[in-house]
UniProtKB/Swiss-Prot annotation:
SUPFAM superfamilies: Anticodon-binding domain of a subclass of class I aminoacyl-tRNA synthetases (SSF47323), Nucleotidylyl transferase (SSF52374). This is Cysteine--tRNA ligase. Its EC number is 6.1.1.16. It comes from Neisseria gonorrhoeae (strain ATCC 700825 / FA 1090). GO terms for molecular function: ATP binding; cysteine-tRNA ligase activity; zinc ion binding.
Length: 473
């Protein structure tokens, strides 16, 4: 049985879906005003891995990852660029999909857009007002009254008083409490707006996910995921909105209380992936260590980046550096070299359990333990290297495939990747042919010169009785 660390209860719990025939997972997606960065890459890869594993375990999963296509940043960027919001959104949604495809991330089953769900958001806000959880302000905004939700702060583990003292809150004379957050923003000149009972305006960020998840999944569902930075306030606010509107919780006995109040959530399991740091520092544009996925993929093969992300446990901080990416590249190269030297036979995991498969499955069932699962892959590769057993090589490829690795032709991986060395495959093959002729002519100086030239471009040659093969270093 799969065990999942639940951020809400701060402990591992057996995964027991509300309806085993209809497992539902919602992940907060991207705000599409710029190219995706490494933090986005981690969210995409981590929850792709989780979706793949749940399906491997036989669960019929519906995976939803939303797109925020209306936001202050989107409005500002479109104005700055002199383009419409629709044009900006379309451009960066396409770029997001291209980045995800490159990283081997399967498309979610549903990708709802915020602007396609405005009526649902308005309806939820109306319900919150009727339930005494929200109030219209004199300026045309609508706010959530956090004091009216007794369990507020349960996800972050803080009381309202703790939050008021420790968090920077917006000073707003229209709020009843500084911690109250906006559900509906009154229209501003030149900004997109929709009609509502409170006047023209647009939704706040937090209500978007509550309304979209409720529209697709109903009042309760199994898994809600996202980056650790969303735990507070975004996910905290989602709970307040969703439970405040429906009055329904997931029915799970979380066996805990929050400052004297029973824990109440519409979601059974809350999952959060850890932060990405760059050379030990927080990734930020102000520090000049902010990297988009596209920038990284100019230097590294996309599968290397995916492998780098999966080598760390999803909840742990992940430290990005060239040294760590180079190490990941070398490690993945070793696995593909094994599959090059011993071509994989067909292997059916459902019919061929062995010690390696059992340990891999046990690792993944323990809160998606990719660190231990990847370690099993390397032990298995070591056995394949010793035995040249094509059946075991097939097992290696099949296990890697569960988490989206090792599915390419080994030669294509070893000779492919980001071509930052300046030599195309054709140029390399030509140099190798010239070196072969030089060796046949016993022109050792020319042969060495070509080898040195290839080494300068990080092209590694492997001479054997069957000829010369090569890979990018």
């Amino acid at each position: 049985m799969t065990a999942i660390y639940n951020t809400l209860t701060r402990q591992k719990e057996p995964f027991a879906p509300i309806d085993p025939e209809n497992v539902r997972m919602y992940v907060c997606g991207m705000t599409v005003y710029d190219y995706c960065h490494l933090g986005h890459a981690r969210v995409m890869v981590v929850f792709d891995m989780i979706a793949r594993w749940l399906r491997e375990c036989g669960y019929p999963l519906t995976y939803v990852r939303n797109i925020t296509d209306i936001d202050d940043k989107i409005i500002a960027r479109a104005a700055e660029n002199g383009e419409t919001i629709g044009e900006l959104n379309a451009r960066f949604i396409q770029a997001m999909h291209e980045d995800a495809d490159a990283l081997g991330v399967l498309r979610p089953d549903i990708e709802p857009k915020a602007t396609e769900n405005i009526p649902q958001m308005i309806a939820m806000i109306e319900t919150l007002i009727q339930n005494g959880k929200a109030y219209p302000a004199a300026n045309g905004d609508v706010y959530y009254a956090v004091r009216e939700f007794a369990a507020y702060g349960q996800l972050s583990g803080k009381s309202l008083d703790d939050l008021r003292a420790g968090e920077r809150v917006e000073v707003d004379g229209f709020k009843r409490d500084p911690l109250d957050f906006v559900l509906w923003k009154a229209a501003k000149a030149g900004e997109p707006a929709w009609e509502s009972p409170w006047g023209n305006g647009r939704p706040g960020w937090h209500i978007e996910c509550s309304a979209m998840s409720e529209n697709l999944f109903g009042d309760t569902f199994d898994i809600h995921g996202g980056g650790a930075d969303l735990q507070f306030p975004h996910h905290e606010n989602e709970i307040a909105q969703s439970v405040g509107a429906s009055g329904h919780t997931c029915g799970h006995d979380h066996a805990q209380t929050h400052h004297g109040q029973s824990i109440a959530s519409h979601v059974k399991y809350w999952l959060h992936n850890g932060f990405i740091r760059v050379d030990g520092e927080k990734m930020s544009k102000s520090l000049g260590n902010f990297f988009t996925i596209r920038e990284v993929l100019k230097q590294y093969d996309p599968e290397v980046v995916r492998f780098f992300i999966l080598r760390a446990h999803y909840r742990s901080p992940l430290n990005y550096s060239d040294a760590h990416l180079d190490d990941a590249k070398g490690a993945l190269t070793r696995l593909y070299t094994t599959l090059k030297n011993t071509p994989a036979a067909e292997f059916d995991l459902s019919e061929n359990a062995n010690g390696y498969t059992r340990r891999f499955y046990a690792a993944m069932n323990d809160d998606f333990g990719t660190v231990e699962a990847v370690a099993v892959l390397f032990e298995l590769a070591g056995e394949v290297n010793k035995t040249n057993d094509a059946h075991l090589a097939g097992c290696l490829k099949a296990l890697g495939g569960i988490i989206g690795l090792l599915q390419r032709n080994p030669i294509e991986f070893l000779q492919g990747g980001a071509v930052s060395d300046g030599l195309s495959n054709e140029e390399i093959e030509d140099l190798i042919a010239r070196r072969k002729q030089a060796r046949a002519d016993k022109n050792w100086a020319e042969s060495d010169r070509i080898r040195d030239l290839l080494n300068e471009h990080k092209i590694i040659l492997e001479d054997s009785a069957g000829g010369t093969t090569w890979r990018r270093g």
